């Protein structure tokens, strides 16, 4: 009856006993990739008597009445991820179990830090600083906003060379306008099969080196999309080197179901513990680099953690993943590496930027979700890497989003300092182009949730600085108008503030924001 129940290997497990006030029910939870536990919120009310709640990489628990909080967070991820489970007993937050499933008992565990304090948001900010210092990460995002064009969110996989070149010309024409693009990036469509990244599909007649030169001659960096650790079973690289891939228990390449249409839908994962595979990765990126490409959108990174048999029996999926990332970084040290579907901790030190939300779309539900996911990870901004909020959307065509939805989307670029778009500048309306330009020209630094943010809800008020001056924002993703006092955004209620998104003029004391809309104030 229980023949399918298998014993669990004896991996690293520890527990943190909690001594919180009775009735403590607050928890902040995290996902270790760009997806997010977004509903009802990343802050939850831990109801129940004897039950469990999980979080990846970091967890905060505590009591909102007495402002007593404890944070536990992973500081390193060299061989294993760290998972946290809050265990409740008799309705109390009893203990946190710490699991590192790829660390065996007796092996050196990944480092974990425990912090205590009366401000859970400050604990997360302090935690991010500790991680950055421990991993010797550089300072990110000190210059101007990163701007550019990506084909995906307008054309998706149906993009043609003609589409790209028309948008390249539009971006070049507008470089002297309010939106000056730094990068033009091809996103899918150019390759023959997933995995054969340097093999150009015949539907793209102009060689990629010539396209890249046209981009750079226009004053922009040339960028490209690829999934470096994956190949489809239809690819040339898989057919020529089936021994290069992670294997299942029977010694066959292990297959996962991908999101691409057939015949590209069955994916295998490169075994990056094989030296020849590391050289293959280096060659792929160096070939692109020789063609003039210096911006790489590396997608599907989480698939590079496939469990299975590798050439090095001592490697874990995470340690093998980092070998691959190291090879790529060494191959193109002067290029910008953007991680998508990125396991955050495993990527530290190897990437310049990381997507921190799911894919967006030009509709309200997606923009709301992406907005919340991005501001919920404010503590990562410019500490782990440049946080990429996914593309900002201002366009009126191929869209069901309202102008208010667009302002929320634009705010994700302003808060992170990354403002890539897929909007077609040949068809965008003048007022929408002006709005898009704000995401390129304005950076709200020191961005953080302001006022009260309790369990089971989302904040609406945020504080920060713009050009060294006090700034506040209201991001209303609800179905009702919200009114926010200036002091709840860290602003002086007696001092005029200029509204920057809607051109509302000078305001003071309070501001009311309509449903699914945003305002940005600077004093």
Where does each model-flagged region fall?
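N-terminal accessory beta-strand-rich subdomains and adjacent acidic, glycine-rich linkers
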Residues: 1-126
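Aromatic-lined carbohydrate-binding/catalytic grooves of carbohydrate-active enzymes
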Residues: 145, 149, 154-286, 295-298, ...
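Solvent-exposed beta-hairpin/edge-strand motifs
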Residues: 489-503
């Amino acid at each position: 009856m229980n023949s399918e129940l298998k014993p669990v290997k004896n991996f690293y497990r520890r527990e943190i006993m909690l001594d919180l006030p009775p009735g403590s029910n607050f928890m902040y939870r995290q996902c270790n990739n760009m997806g997010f536990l977004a509903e009802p919120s990343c802050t939850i009310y831990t109801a129940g008597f004897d039950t469990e709640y999980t979080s990846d990489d970091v967890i905060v628990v505590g009591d909102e009445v007495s402002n007593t909080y404890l944070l536990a967070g992973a500081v390193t991820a060299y061989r294993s991820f760290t998972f946290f489970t809050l265990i409740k007993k008799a309705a109390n937050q009893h203990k946190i179990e710490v699991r590192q499933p790829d660390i065996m008992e007796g092996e050196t565990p990944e480092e974990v830090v425990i912090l205590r304090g009366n401000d859970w948001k400050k604990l997360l900010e302090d935690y991010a600083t500790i991680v950055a210092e421990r991993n010797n990460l550089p300072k990110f995002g000190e210059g101007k906003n990163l701007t550019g064009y990506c084909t995906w969110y307008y054309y998706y996989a149906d993009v043609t060379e003609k589409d790209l070149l028309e948008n390249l010309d539009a971006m070049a024409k507008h470089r002297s306008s309010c939106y000056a693009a730094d990068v033009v990036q091809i996103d899918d469509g150019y390759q023959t099969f997933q995995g054969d990244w340097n093999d150009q599909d015949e539907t793209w007649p102009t060689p990629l080196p010539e396209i890249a030169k046209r981009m750079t001659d226009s004053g922009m960096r040339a960028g490209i999309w690829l999934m470096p650790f994956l190949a489809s079973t239809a690819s040339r690289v898989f057919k020529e080197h089936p021994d290069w891939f992670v294997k299942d228990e029977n010694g066959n390449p292990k297959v996962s179901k991908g999101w691409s249409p057939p015949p590209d839908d069955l994916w295998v994962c490169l075994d990056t513990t094989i030296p020849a595979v590391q050289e293959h990765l280096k060659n792929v990126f160096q070939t692109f680099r020789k063609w003039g490409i210096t911006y790489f959108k590396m997608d599907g990174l989480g698939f590079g953690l496939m469990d299975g048999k590798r050439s090095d029996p001592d490697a874990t999926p995470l340690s093998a993943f980092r070998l691959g990332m190291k090879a790529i970084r060494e191959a193109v040290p002067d290029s910008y590496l953007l991680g998508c579907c990125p396991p955050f901790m495993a990527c530290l030190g190897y990437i310049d930027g990381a997507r921190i939300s799911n894919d967006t779309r030009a509709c309200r539900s997606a923009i709301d979700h992406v907005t919340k996911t991005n501001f919920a990870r404010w503590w990562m901004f410019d500490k782990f890497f440049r946080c990429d909020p996914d593309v900002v959307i201002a366009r009126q065509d191929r869209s069901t989003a309202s102008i208010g939805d667009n302002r929320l989307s634009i705010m994700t670029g302003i808060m992170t300092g990354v403002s890539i778009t897929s909007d077609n500048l040949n068809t965008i309306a003048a007022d929408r182009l002006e709005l898009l330009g704000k995401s390129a020209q304005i950076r709200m630094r020191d961005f953080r949730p302001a006022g009260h943010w309790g369990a089971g809800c989302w904040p609406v008020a945020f504080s920060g600085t713009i050009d060294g001056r006090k700034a506040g924002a209201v991001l209303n993703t609800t179905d009702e108008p919200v009114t926010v006092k200036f002091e709840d955004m860290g602003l002086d209620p007696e001092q005029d503030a200029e509204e920057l998104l809607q051109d509302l003029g000078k305001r003071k004391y309070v501001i009311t924001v309509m449903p699914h809309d945003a305002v940005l104030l600077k004093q």
